């Protein structure tokens, strides 16, 4: 790439200032070192689950420090994240989950219980450390290009149905 990707910039900052605070949410704090290390481990698990370039991963989580780990991990695995507001009605969430073609949903255990997951859609609870925290600490080796998707964000849509807008790594 002509310039580093966002997840590479975070890793660079983690090497430069690992103790500096990267995420502050209420009482939750993550240093750059912790954020990068946790995102690497989760990314390793995501790659094991088939995430890579152009693979979309929905993120349906309460706002928290760990949601930042999830966003970063998807980018490190080469996937494209699709943030979903869990306050939306079940019908709207189901539509977006089906429309975006997500291969996986990252969520939290209590949120998972009320998510309207389409049949066959796999999920991983980020707040279940047994799911991913024993993975290697290094970032997975992923071959990414600027034109690969980074994320898909849904707007309200003029037809009443949410409309997904895809953004690649280049403009990010």
Region roles according to the model:
Residues 1-172:
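Carrier-protein-dependent adenylate-forming modules in NRPS/ANL systems
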């Amino acid at each position: 790439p002509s310039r580093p990707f966002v997840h590479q910039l975070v890793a660079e900052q983690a090497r430069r200032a690992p103790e500096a605070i990267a995420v502050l949410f209420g009482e939750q704090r993550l240093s750059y070192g912790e954020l990068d290390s946790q995102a690497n481990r989760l990314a390793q698990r995501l790659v094991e689950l088939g995430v890579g370039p152009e693979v979309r991963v929905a993120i349906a989580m309460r706002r928290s420090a760990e949601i930042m780990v999830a966003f970063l991990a998807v980018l490190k695995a080469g996937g494209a994240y699709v943030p979903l507001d869990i306050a939306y009605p079940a019908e709207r969430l189901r539509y977006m989950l089906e429309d975006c073609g997500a291969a996986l949903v990252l969520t939290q255990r209590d949120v998972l219980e009320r998510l309207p997951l389409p049949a066959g859609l796999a999920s991983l609870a980020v707040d279940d450390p047994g799911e991913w925290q024993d993975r290697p600490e290094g970032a997975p080796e992923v071959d990414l290009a600027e034109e690969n998707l980074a994320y898909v964000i849904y707007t309200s849509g003029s037809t009443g149905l949410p409309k997904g807008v895809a953004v690649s790594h280049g403009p990010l």
